[in-house]
Amino acid sequence: MSLTSRASARKRRHVRLRKKISGTCDRPRLSVTRSNRHVFVQAVDDISGKTLVSASTMEKDIRALELGKTERALAVGKLVAQRALAVGVKSAVFDRGGCKYTGRVAAVAEGAREAGLQT
């Protein structure tokens, strides 16, 4: 499969997914964006259009860890869950961003669940 068709397939999956889910203030959307090197996670309230908390592998605490990409994604999931719990969010809707639920995307969800966030 060529790179352009893979990217367009991911975009189609994401559009299809976003039709079905949206976040609220009580239960925000946990949006995962993945690049070749980094993972970015945001807890988004779609009603007001605001990001409540965010975390990524580009933060100093996570960058300092001598881990692989999947283990760092797990740490990002734990970090975003801790920050969400600190602002009073107990559960979230998981938005995989059109990516398949495996590897780093699944690790973010597992990390968030381990830290106490219900997804």
UniProtKB/Swiss-Prot annotation:
Q: Does the keyword Nuclease apply?
A: no
| One annotated GO biological process | translation
GO terms for CC?
cytosolic large ribosomal subunit
SUPFAM superfamilies recorded for this chain?
Translational machinery components (SSF53137)
Any Pfam family matching the protein? Ribosomal_L18p
What's an example of a GO molecular-function annotation for this chain?
structural constituent of ribosome
Question: Keywords assigned by UniProt?
Answer: Ribonucleoprotein, Ribosomal protein, RNA-binding, rRNA-binding
Question: What is said about its interaction partners and assembly?
Answer: Part of the 50S ribosomal subunit; part of the 5S rRNA/L5/L18/L25 subcomplex. Contacts the 5S and 23S rRNAs.
Q: Which PANTHER family match?
A: 39S RIBOSOMAL PROTEIN L18, MITOCHONDRIAL, LARGE RIBOSOMAL SUBUNIT PROTEIN UL18M
**Its biological function?**
This is one of the proteins that bind and probably mediate the attachment of the 5S RNA into the large ribosomal subunit, where it forms part of the central protuberance.
Report the sequence similarity comment from the record: Belongs to the universal ribosomal protein uL18 family.
The name on file for this protein is Large ribosomal subunit protein uL18
Q: Which species does this protein come from?
A: Tropheryma whipplei (strain Twist) (Whipple's bacillus)
| Organism lineage string | Bacteria, Bacillati, Actinomycetota, Actinomycetes, Micrococcales
- Report which gene this protein is encoded by: rplR
